[in-house]
């Protein structure tokens, strides 16, 4: 098992490959990496996103340190990037890194993913970077990847207090909303298409760290972040595959008004005394993903019985932002879909004259194939690769 590195400066090289165990950094700041080396089982991600509040433009980007990907022959250090432009065009990029470099100052934590084409990662001419303020007041994702994406997504938090539900979400899954809500500014260009995306909107920043490979942990996951007038809500939910929790929905929600928390809970059990949320799928709308999940939106309720408070929001998918199959059909029918959605709602009986607010949000839905299916898929790929490289039979 790899030994923990001390907090400070270190780097992770993709070429070194994963170890069997976890190299914990033991750093107290959740924006800092949890692991200082690649692991076959332990992995983590940083997600930053922003959306213009008419729903016409947005950016979502996720940075990964994920040694479990090597099981499938995939690169362990990578970034997924999706941008929606006002004319409806979509810029999608999968950026592969050779390394991750980590350093911190009194003011910030900096993580840099130098691009794989840099060989050993010693050149800095092509990279993707996150810089997060130590107090989580700001975060900036910067890209200098010629031919793909250049520019930045800058987030300035309006979240007034730390996430009270940070930590374990379910078996082998931990999560923190670094910024439940933030002002977002995008200034990005895409050399391949000659396009540019500039907008101001709202967004947030989340962190996840896992202690098992993704398909072993969960069968489904749903990510929600929405904004409507003074309100912002955010959630991550997973349906566990682990032990006695198999089939259990593990989810948390937080609701802000003007940056101040008015609701936070991990309970979706209806109660006359305890705070709870209810997230119900909607069907029959015009926009849905192409996979097994046919959800076209959600009805979301936050209830605080003792305080006599109730907030309700309608979330309706407006655009499919991305759609990625997780294997070839018919063996695999599951996938990863993202949506830009319209958000409408407010406090039930609480706002003046029952005022309803409108805005936009983004939704991510993932359904994972069974681990046995992925193992079968890996075997089929290996057989196909062997057949492709086998010498042709000699002519008689």
Curated annotation (Swiss-Prot):
Keywords: Isomerase. Disulfide bonds: none annotated. This is Diels-Alderase mpsD. Diels-Alderase; part of the gene cluster that mediates the biosynthesis of macrophasetins, 3-decalinoyltetramic acids (DTAs) which feature a tetramate (pyrrolidine-2,4-dione) unit connected to a decalin fragment and that have potent bioactivities. The PKS-NRPS mpsA together with its associated enoylreductase partner mpsG incorporate one unit of acetyl-CoA, seven units of malonyl-CoA, and one unit of L-alanine to assemble the linear tetramic acid intermediate corresponding to the backbone of macrophasetins. One of its GO terms (molecular function) is isomerase activity. Pathway: Secondary metabolite biosynthesis. Signal peptide: none annotated. Its EC number is 5.5.1.-. It comes from the Eukaryota. It is an enzyme of class 5 (isomerase). Belongs to the Diels-Alderase family. The gene is mpsD.
């Amino acid at each position: 098992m790899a030994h923990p590195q001390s907090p400070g400066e270190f780097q992770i090289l993709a070429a070194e490959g994963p170890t069997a165990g976890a190299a914990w950094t033991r750093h107290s700041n959740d924006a800092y990496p949890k692991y200082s080396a690649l692991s076959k089982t332990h992995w983590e991600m940083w997600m930053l996103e922003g959306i213009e509040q008419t729903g016409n433009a947005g950016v979502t980007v996720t940075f990964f340190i994920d040694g479990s990907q090597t099981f499938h022959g995939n690169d362990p250090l990578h970034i997924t990037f999706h941008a929606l432009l006002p004319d409806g065009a979509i810029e999608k990029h999968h950026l592969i890194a050779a390394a991750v470099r980590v350093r911190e100052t009194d003011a910030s934590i900096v993580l840099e993913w130098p691009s794989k084409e840099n060989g050993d990662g010693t050149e800095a001419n092509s990279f993707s970077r996150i810089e997060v303020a130590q107090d989580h007041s700001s975060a900036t994702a910067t890209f200098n990847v010629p031919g793909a994406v250049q520019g930045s997504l800058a987030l300035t938090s309006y979240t007034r207090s730390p996430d009270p539900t940070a930590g374990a979400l379910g078996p082998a899954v931990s999560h923190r909303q670094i910024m439940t809500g933030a002002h977002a500014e995008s200034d990005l260009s895409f050399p391949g298409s000659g396009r540019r995306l500039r907008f101001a909107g709202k967004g947030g920043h989340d962190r996840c760290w896992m202690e098992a490979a993704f398909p072993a942990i969960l069968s489904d996951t749903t990510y929600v972040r929405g904004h409507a007038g003074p309100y912002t809500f955010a959630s991550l939910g997973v349906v566990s595959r682990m032990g006695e929790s198999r089939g259990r929905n593990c989810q948390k929600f937080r609701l802000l008004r003007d940056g101040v928390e008015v609701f936070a809970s991990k309970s979706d059990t209806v109660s006359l005394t305890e705070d709870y949320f209810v997230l119900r799928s909607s069907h029959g709308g015009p926009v849905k993903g192409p996979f097994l999940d046919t959800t076209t939106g959600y009805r979301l309720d936050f209830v605080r019985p003792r305080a006599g408070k109730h907030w309700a929001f309608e979330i309706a998918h407006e655009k499919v932002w991305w759609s990625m199959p997780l294997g070839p059909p018919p063996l695999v029918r599951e996938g990863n879909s993202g949506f830009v959605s319209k958000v409408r709602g407010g406090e039930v009986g609480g706002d003046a004259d029952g005022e309803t607010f409108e805005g936009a949000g983004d939704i991510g839905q993932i359904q994972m194939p069974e681990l046995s299916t992925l193992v079968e898929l890996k075997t089929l790929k290996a057989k196909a690769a062997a057949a492709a490289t086998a010498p042709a039979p000699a002519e008689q």
